[in-house]
Amino acid sequence: GNATSERLPTDPVYPXV
């Protein structure tokens, strides 16, 4: 979960954060 650079089914993405 890196802002918008990492999108994995097991790692939810939090924009902005």
From Swiss-Prot:
Name listed for the protein in its UniProt record: Putative large ribosomal subunit protein YmL35
Keyword DNA-binding: no
Functional note: Putative component of the large subunit of mitochondrial ribosome.
Keywords for this protein: Mitochondrion, Ribonucleoprotein, Ribosomal protein
An annotated GO cellular component: mitochondrion
Keyword Mitochondrion in annotation: yes
Domain of life: Eukaryota
Entry's localization field: Mitochondrion
